Amino acid sequence: MLDIQLLRSNTAAVAERLARRGYDFDTARFDALEERRKSVQVKTEELQASRNSISKQIGALKGQGKHEEAQAAMDQVAQIKTDLEQAAADLDAVQKELDAWLLSIPNLPHESVPPGKDETENVEVRKVGTPREFDFEIKDHVDLGEPLGLDFEGGAKLSGARFTVMRGQIARLHRALAQFMLDTHMLQHGYTEHYTPYIVDDTTLQGTGQLPKFAEDLFHVTRGGDETKTTQYLIPTAEVTLTNTVAGSIIPSEQLPLKLTAHSPCFRSEAGSYGKDTRGLIRQHQFDKVEMVQIVHPEKSYGALEEMVGHAENILKALELPYRVITLCTGDMGFSAAKTYDLEVWVPAQNTYREISSCSNCEDFQARRMKARFKDENGKNRLVHTLNGSGLAVGRTLVAVLENHQNADGSINIPAALQPYMGGVTKLEVK
C-alpha cells in the first residue's frame, strides 16, 4: 500500500510514477475524496468545539436557576451528539472507500527501473554460461521425462489439465532438487528454513498484495461443515506465508535482516494463460518452489536485492545451467514490486531462455499493508522493507536439468552437486 501522506503531499508526482508502469491514477477522484474527508473533519471539529462550549454553559445556567435555558442547552448537546455520530459514519465511509482504492494501487517503481510497456522492453543485465551445442537431435523435457516417470495423463485423470504425476526416478530427482536448494540457502546463504500452512485467509493475502486485485488467480477453498462458508485460499507462493510471519510485529533493529526460506507447493489458476505453455511442466496449476524472503532495514534493501539474486544464481551455477539475468521494465513488474530481476534459464528444446526465478524488492509496500515494523536506533517504530525471490521453481529447474543434461540415448547426466541427494546416482537411464 502506498503512503497516504506521500499521496497527499505529492499527488502529481505519484501519479506520474504510477503512469510509468501503465497505471492511470485518477487524481480527480483522489482530490474529491480528500475534499470530502477534510470537509467532514472540519465539521467534526466544529461540532466538538460547539459541544464543549455549550457543555460548559450548562452548569453555569443551572447554578443561576435558569433551568429552561439549561434544558435547551442540553437538547443542543444531544443533537450535536447525533450529528457527531453521523459525521463519524461519513468519515468512516470516506476512509473505507479510500482504503479499498489504495489496496488496488500498485507500488511505485524505483528510479533505477527501466521504462517500458511490456516484457519486450526488459533489459538484459548479464548472461552466465554458454548453451550447449548438441551433436544429436535434442528432445524436450516431455519426451525425455515420460520414459523416466513423468506422467501427464495420470495428472489429468486425477485433477484435469495442468496437473502432473511423477514417479520413480523423476520423482526422486524432483525431491533432490528441492532438498539441494533448501540446504544451499540454509547452509551457505544463512536463511532459516520454515514450514508454513498451504491454506491462508484473505487478510494474509491482502498483506502481500495478492488480494483484492488478483482473486481470480487463486484457488478458493471452504471448510467442510462451516456454515458461514468462510473462504480461504491455497497459497500461490510461500512468499505469502513467510512474509506474513512478521505481520503486526515490531522487530528490534539488531535482529535484522531476517532471512527466511521454505519449500512448498504453489497453486495458481493461471486465469490469464489459456493456451500458453500447454505442453509439459512450464505452466502448471500446482508446482513446487523454494522461496526466499528477507525482512530488512530500509537503507539496506537494495543491497539485499542484489544479494538475493546472487543466491538464486548460485543454484543455477551449481546445477551447471546457462542462464541470464534481466531487469524488468516498469510495465512488466509485479503489483507489489518496486524493482524486480528475473533469472531465465536456457531451455534447449525451445531455443530460448525461460523465467525460473523472480527476485523483488517491495520496499515498504507490503509492510504498510501488514503493519510490519522495526524499532530503529532512536527507538522510533518504522516500516521494514520486504524482499522475495524464487530459489528456485522446482518444476522448471527439473525441465532445465533434463534438457540441458540429456544424452543421445535419452539418459540424463546428474550434475555433481545433486549426486549426494540422489544416493550417488550419476545418470538417469530408461529401464
UniProtKB/Swiss-Prot annotation:
Its EC number is 6.1.1.11. GO terms for biological process: selenocysteine biosynthetic process; seryl-tRNA aminoacylation. PROSITE patterns: AA_TRNA_LIGASE_II (PS50862). L-serine binds at T237, A238, E239, E291, S390. CDD domains: SerRS_core. Transmembrane segments: none annotated. ATP binds at R268, S269, E270, E355, I356, S357, S358. Its main location: cytoplasm. Keywords: Aminoacyl-tRNA synthetase, ATP-binding, Cytoplasm, Ligase, Nucleotide-binding, Protein biosynthesis. It is found in: Cytoplasm. Pathway: Aminoacyl-tRNA biosynthesis; selenocysteinyl-tRNA(Sec) biosynthesis; L-seryl-tRNA(Sec) from L-serine and tRNA(Sec): step 1/1. One of its GO terms (molecular function) is serine-tRNA ligase activity. It catalyses: tRNA(Ser) + L-serine + ATP = L-seryl-tRNA(Ser) + AMP + diphosphate + H(+); tRNA(Sec) + L-serine + ATP = L-seryl-tRNA(Sec) + AMP + diphosphate + H(+). GO terms for cellular component: cytoplasm. Belongs to the class-II aminoacyl-tRNA synthetase family. Type-1 seryl-tRNA synthetase subfamily. Consists of two distinct domains, a catalytic core and a N-terminal extension that is involved in tRNA binding. Catalyzes the attachment of serine to tRNA(Ser). Is also able to aminoacylate tRNA(Sec) with serine, to form the misacylated tRNA L-seryl-tRNA(Sec), which will be further converted into selenocysteinyl-tRNA(Sec). HAMAP family: Ser_tRNA_synth_type1 (MF_00176). Homodimer. The tRNA molecule binds across the dimer. This is Serine--tRNA ligase. The gene is serS.
